[in-house]
Design a protein with these regions (language model features):
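N-terminal FAD cofactor-binding segment of flavoenzymes
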Residues: 1-32, 47, 107, 111
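FAD-binding beta-loop-beta segment adjacent to the flavin cofactor pocket
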Residues: 16, 132-135, 190-212, 262, ...
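N-terminal Rossmann-like dinucleotide/flavin-binding domain of flavoprotein oxidoreductases
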Residues: 22, 29, 40-60
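A short, flexible beta-alpha/helix-coil linker loop
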Residues: 32-34, 155-157, 217-220
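Short, solvent-exposed loop/turn segments at secondary-structure boundaries
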Residues: 38-41, 99, 160-164, 223-226
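Predominantly flavin-linked oxidoreductase catalytic cores and closely associated redox partners
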Residues: 55-185, 193-202, 211
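Conserved mid-domain beta->alpha element of the FAD-binding
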Residues: 197-269
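C-terminal helical "tail/cap" subdomain of flavin- and related membrane-associated enzymes
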Residues: 239-341
Length: 341
């Protein structure tokens, strides 16, 4: 997570749980490499689990599948039921025909290497790798002198994840870089939505009266698919709710989600350009052009705070994709329905 993604108090709230914070990061493309001075933090699932377990103590229920979640309680697969005035559904993305999506798919291996890797900063986007049938890059996170997370990320039209194929690719890249893997410490994988358009009101209506957060509630960055920064905002919204009841919190979250959707329209245009305006092997050129822009603009992009001037700066100049194809991508989808609740 980049430091400017969250407000100052939001960053301060989660900073104790970061495994590491770096003073900057790098990117690599066929035409150049660049180092940026934006602070970057690594928050692991283990750290989040530890914080949650410490806060909930004996009230934490683990290893149980939730079959039903309603505004007044939840029912588990083992037959247990819980009643509560406030139920929050954070079970991740759910399939919905209301939204049209591309997908950010990734598999990462945290490895202990036989020798130090030599990286001092994260490389959040290494697009010098083979592109093939989609926009693809590697994400490299140096967690220690000989500990390295190597993640293969692909922006794909289909959500299916070829776990074995991704893993083989990661090991091949490690070999090319001269990194001999002594041990795989853990694996992570995911498929995140990259929204191209749709009827957000219909998406919200599918949730019923249960407050939904994270990807399930539509709270994620429209281009990266990441949800941590918006999770901080929604947590603050819930914590300050005048009445902690499911229906009241659901209304407040819907209002926030609709406001976010309306503010994210420009990102959905860019997403359509990425997925529809260039041949798959050429899509990296869009990001290659983007990362030449000033660092403050890049920070505002990931923080969801683009100004009108920023949007103009992103679009002006010689486009990295054919002009007619870009126009078709912008205009080629059906008119987006207005969000409603």
């Amino acid at each position: 997570m980049f430091r400017p993604d969250a407000a100052k108090d939001g960053w301060s709230a989660i900073e104790p749980y970061f495994e590491r914070i770096w003073s900057g990061y790098t990117v690599a493309f066929p035409e150049y490499r660049r180092r940026l001075g934006t602070e970057y933090g690594c928050l692991t699932g283990a750290a989040l689990y530890g914080a949650t377990a410490a806060a909930l103590g004996a009230n934490l229920v683990e290893g149980a599948e939730v079959l039903e979640a309603g505004p007044d309680g939840a029912r588990l697969a083992d037959g247990r039921s819980f009643l509560a005035p406030l139920v929050i559904d954070g079970r991740g993305w759910r399939h919905s025909t209301a939204l049209r999506c591309g997908w950010q798919k990734f598999v990462g291996l945290e490895c202990r290497l036989e020798q130090p890797h030599g990286l001092d900063l994260p490389m959040v986007m290494d697009a010098e790798v083979e592109q093939a049938d989609c926009f693809r890059f590697l994400y490299l996170l140096p967690l220690g002198p000989d500990r390295l997370l190597i993640e293969d990320t692909r922006y794909s039209a289909e959500p299916e994840l070829d776990l074995r194929g991704f893993t083989v690719s990661i090991r091949r890249h490690a070999g090319v870089r001269g990194w001999r893997i002594a041990e795989v410490l853990r694996r992570e994988e995911g498929v995140l939505p990259v929204v191209l358009g749709g009827d957000f009101g219909a998406f919200l209506a599918e949730q019923g009266s249960v407050p939904a957060v994270g990807a399930r509630g539509g709270f994620f960055h429209p281009t990266s698919g990441y949800s941590l920064a918006r999770a901080i905002d929604t947590a603050a919204l819930i914590a300050t709710a005048p009445r902690p009841a499911s229906r009241d919190v659901a209304t407040a979250l819907r209002q926030r989600a609709i406001a976010d959707w309306r503010g994210d329209g420009f990102y959905r245009v860019l997403n359509r350009m990425l997925f529809q305006a260039a041949a798959p092997a050429e899509r990296y050129r869009i990001l290659q052009r983007f990362y030449r822009l000033p660092q403050p603009l890049i920070e505002r992009f990931y923080g969801g705070r683009l100004t009108l001037a920023d949007k103009a700066r992103i679009l002006l100049g010689r486009p990295p994709v054919p002009i007619l194809a870009a126009l078709r991508a912008v205009r080629g989808l059906p008119q987006e329905a207005s969000a409603h609740a």
